[in-house]
């Protein structure tokens, strides 16, 4: 009976390594606590976390509204992969244009997606205002907070319903459920709110509230597709969490010194970091980021793409890597790497120029 109750979701606990294990469980509890959520789900990568979130919220023929200033891999997932494999479409909007998010919402829209600090320019979006728009239309706000971490901002406090972090960065591949979204009242997510045939007719919204969202992903999507985080990597992430605040504090402090230096350099056209008063989103920096604006930002060197690449090739301390948030400082040319799937027009539309260089300060 004990085993039957576990498999029937009537009793919470470990069943099988693909779904959870004790080490992952501790990691998930700590992440949920850091973000102020009710539960979390750790998976094998940030890409899996994003993909699982979208697949849990939208089905074939449905739609997602997203900021256009996001990581190139997520942009490609929404623009090409999900339409081709799942029939889920997306509309990308200018987050700085007034009314853009609400204007893009359709009858079949199932979520709004933003990043706390956009990749690669670290632009800010008014989380609180976008959350109000999402809830007005009975859909959740999903926030990728990889660049910020809960040390800098906790999106759930400003109305976000689901928070995602990417693996290999400050924290790890994880989905956090705020527990605040009313899946039953929305009426837009019957696979969560109504009897689910995959579990003999239980309603996740009733049987597993307030953690219905991550329980649905764990019990259905993770169970059937298996992008599982290993216990060893969960252990490593737990070690990292012990020093998260200290590390991010030092990252931010070092980044501000580089931002100040580049802002005054004659060979630099522009620097994009939310702490700068010249940035359009600086007023949001004051509202959301009292502990600093992160350590990942871009600048535009005077010249063209070849100038940028020559500059990168001649750096002695920085490592040329697509990752961010490492203890060592990293550099990349976004237009030809992290956002290389985008067309030239899409790159410019996202604020990425041929001479844009992204830095991640260690």
Protein language model features and the residues they cover:
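Conserved N-terminal alpha-helix of the aminotransferase class I/II PLP-enzyme fold
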Residues: 1-51, 73-82
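Short amphipathic alpha-helical segments
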Residues: 12, 38, 233, 237, ...
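Alpha-helix boundary recognition
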Residues: 32, 156, 263, 312-316
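Structural motif
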Residues: 35, 86, 266, 315-316
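Conserved PLP-enzyme active-site core in the AAT-like
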Residues: 40-265
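Conserved C-terminal alpha-helix-loop-beta "cap" of PLP-dependent enzymes
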Residues: 248, 267-357, 361
């Amino acid at each position: 009976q004990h085993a039957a109750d576990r498999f029937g979701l009537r009793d919470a606990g470990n069943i099988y390594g693909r779904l959870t294990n004790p080490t992952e469980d501790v990691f998930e509890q700590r992440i949920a606590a850091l973000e102020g959520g009710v539960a979390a789900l750790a998976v094998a990568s940030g890409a899996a976390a994003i993909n699982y979130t979208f697949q849990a919220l939208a089905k074939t023929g449905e739609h997602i509204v997203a900021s256009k200033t996001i990581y190139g891999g997520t942009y490609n997932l929404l623009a090409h992969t999900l339409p081709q494999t799942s029939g889920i479409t997306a509309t990308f909007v200018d987050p700085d244009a007034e009314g853009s998010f609400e204007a893009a919402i359709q009858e079949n829209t199932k979520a709004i997606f933003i990043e706390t600090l956009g990749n690669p320019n670290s632009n800010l979006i008014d989380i609180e205002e976008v959350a109000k728009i999402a809830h007005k239309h009975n859909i959740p706000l999903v926030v990728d907070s990889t660049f910020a971490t809960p040390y800098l901002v906790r999106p759930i406090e400003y109305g976000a319903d689901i928070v995602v972090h990417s693996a290999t960065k400050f924290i790890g591949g994880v989905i956090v459920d705020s527990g605040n979204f009313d899946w039953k009242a929305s009426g837009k997510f019957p696979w969560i709110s109504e009897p689910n045939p995959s579990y003999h007719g239980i309603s996740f919204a009733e049987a597993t509230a307030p953690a219905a969202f991550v329980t649905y992903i764990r019990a259905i999507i993770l169970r059937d597709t298996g992008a599982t985080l290993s216990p060893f990597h969960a252990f490593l992430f737990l070690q990292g969490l012990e020093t998260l605040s200290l590390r991010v504090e030092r990252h931010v402090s070092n980044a501000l010194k580089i931002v100040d230096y580049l802002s005054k350099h004659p060979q630099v056209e522009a620097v994009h970091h939310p702490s700068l008063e010249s940035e359009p989103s600086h007023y949001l920096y004051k509202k959301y980021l009292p502990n600093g604006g992160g350590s990942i930002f871009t600048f535009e060197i005077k010249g063209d793409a070849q100038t940028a690449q020559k500059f990168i090739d001649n750096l002695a301390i920085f490592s040329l890597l697509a990752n961010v948030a490492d203890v060592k400082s990293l550099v990349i040319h976004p237009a030809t790497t992290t956002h290389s799937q985008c067309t030239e027009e899409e790159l410019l539309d996202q604020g990425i120029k041929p001479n844009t260089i992204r830095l991640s300060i260690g």
